[in-house]
UniProtKB/Swiss-Prot annotation:
Subunit structure: Forms a 1:1 stoichiometric complex with (pro)colipase/CLPS.
Pfam families tied to this protein: Lipase, PLAT
Protein purpose: Plays an important role in fat metabolism. It preferentially splits the esters of long-chain fatty acids at positions 1 and 3, producing mainly 2-monoacylglycerol and free fatty acids, and shows considerably higher activity against insoluble emulsified substrates than against soluble ones.
Species name: Sus scrofa
Protein encoded by which gene: PNLIP
Major location (coarse): secreted
GO biological process: cholesterol homeostasis; fatty acid biosynthetic process; high-density lipoprotein particle remodeling; triglyceride catabolic process
Name this polypeptide is given: Pancreatic triacylglycerol lipase
Keyword Membrane tagged: no
Lineage: Eukaryota, Metazoa, Chordata, Craniata, Vertebrata
């Protein structure tokens, strides 16, 4: 069966839209009136109060919408609403770095229902966004190449539908943890995929299986660039889910949203932070997260690393292929940006057991102390590790070394030093520091360039 609506056309429940393994139920989307898609415009001129737009040239021209700016649509997901703070917070961060038409798309009329129905209603949302983009183009001469659609959860697939309906002419779609149930493993027609825009970038933060882990996000790659921060499954600062018994996804409602969805919501928090940290989310190409954490994927290759989030489109090789996978670590709360460094320490002095820590000092900032090695400290041995600093130090000027040995009282007061410390940044730039001194336990040793 099918339903047809003015402006938007017809919607069927034929395969692959329904009646396939991933979507066994034959369900049609609700009417546009019931889904009630709304376009809430924020601009640099009205940062705190939106102007509600409709896809009508006179309404658009009488608003603060400007033809000489990019337009970024932000589409929320299941249970959510367009007036939720996170959408306008992304707009507010954007206003700090650019002039932009920032349109928060509200479809709470269609998102606050059972999940299976909501996953059909996004077809209407995608069609409404596509129609809006078509009106901009046909009535106002505004090119889809100035349009970027950002979608979270089900909103990612609504963005994909908008892109499919505009024949891939939209400049960019960003998927923030695209929803897994009813979408993972389905044909491209139904879900977000790289053909939906000229460039599609995706952040996966909740990619554990829905059963039994309740991971809402897809593990499947669906973009040109797919980022898996912290491995993509368990985000630092999110509690492990104790709802590991199987929950009927159609029975999840608002009270459990933050609790169930901490990992799932991290994706838009990372995006918001990335706007203000243009180099704080470098993603490293790597075979797996385990290989990445084993320090085998550093530094960035010669073409550089893409930045997860807002500046992913600056990566020269962004559309050289689909399903290009990248890994990185983030912080655990509010300031999520991190800068990865590799540090190698060549020891001198006595042979003892202990820990060695190093801190970095640069023209843009200083890092805290990071442990590089613990175990037997043997002169002339070199130990290396990588760490993710919450400070970008810039050009390195000096490093400081310290060691301690776990409260084992050693009456000989041994002295240990670092004859050489090498620091490598993610762009491959290497800095060497040397010292001929040794120090007692818990005494800082400063090494200068050599």
């Amino acid at each position: 069966s099918e339903v047809c609506f003015p402006r938007l056309g017809c919607f069927s429940d034929d395969a692959p839209w329904a009646g396939i393994v991933q979507r066994p139920l034959k369900i049609l989307p609700w009417s546009p009136k019931d889904v009630d898609t709304r376009f809430l415009l924020y601009t640099n001129q009205n940062q705190n109060n939106y102007q509600e737009l409709v896809a009508d040239p006179s309404t658009i021209t009488n608003s603060n919408f400007r033809m000489d700016r990019k337009t970024r649509f932000i589409i929320h997901g299941f249970i959510d609403k367009g007036e939720e703070d996170w959408l306008s917070n992304i707009c507010k961060n954007l206003f700090k770095v650019e002039s932009v038409n920032c349109i928060c798309v509200d479809w709470k009329g269609g998102s606050r229902t059972g999940y299976t129905q909501a996953s059909q209603n996004i077809r209407i949302v995608g069609a409404e966004v596509a129609y809006f983009v078509e009106v901009l183009k046909s009535s106002l001469g505004y090119s889809p190449s100035n349009v970027h659609v950002i979608g979270h959860s089900l909103g990612s697939h609504a963005a994909g539908e908008a892109g499919r309906r505009t024949n891939g002419t939209i400049e960019r779609i960003t998927g923030l943890d695209p929803a897994e149930p009813c979408f993972q493993g389905t044909p491209e027609l139904v879900r977000l995929d790289p053909s939906d825009a000229k460039f599609v970038d995706v952040i996966h933060t909740d990619a554990a299986p829905i059963i039994p882990n309740l991971g809402f996000g897809m593990s499947q790659t669906v973009g040109h660039l797919d980022f898996f921060p912290n491995g993509g499954k368990q985000m630092p600062g999110c509690q492990k889910n104790i709802l590991s018994q199987i929950v009927d996804i159609d029975g999840i409602w608002e009270g459990t949203r933050d609790f169930v969805a901490c990992n799932h919501l991290r994706s838009y928090k990372y995006y918001a932070d990335s706007i203000l940290n243009p180099d704080g989310f470098a993603g490293f190409p790597c075979d797996s997260y385990n290989v990445f954490t084993a320090n085998k994927c550093f530094p960035c290759p010669s073409e550089g690393c893409p930045q997860m989030g807002h500046y992913a489109d600056r990566f020269p090789g962004k559309t050289n292929g689909v399903s290009q996978v990248f890994y990185l670590n983030t912080g655990d709360a509010s300031n999520f940006a991190r800068w990865r460094y590799k540090v190698s320490v060549t020891l001198s002095g006595k042979k003892v057991t202990g820990h060695i820590l190093v801190s970095l000092f640069g023209n843009e900032g200083n890092s805290r102390q990071y442990e590089i090695y613990k175990g037997t400290l043997q002169p002339d041995n070199t130990h290396s590790d990588e760490f993710d600093s919450d400070v970008e130090v810039g050009d390195l000027q000096k490093v400081k070394f310290i060691w301690y040995n776990n409260n084992v009282i050693n009456p000989t007061l041994p002295r240990v030093g670092a004859s050489k410390i090498t620091v490598e940044r993610n762009d491959g730039k290497v800095y060497d520091f040397c010292s001929q001194e040794t120090v007692r336990e818990e005494v800082l040793l400063t090494l200068n360039p050599c």
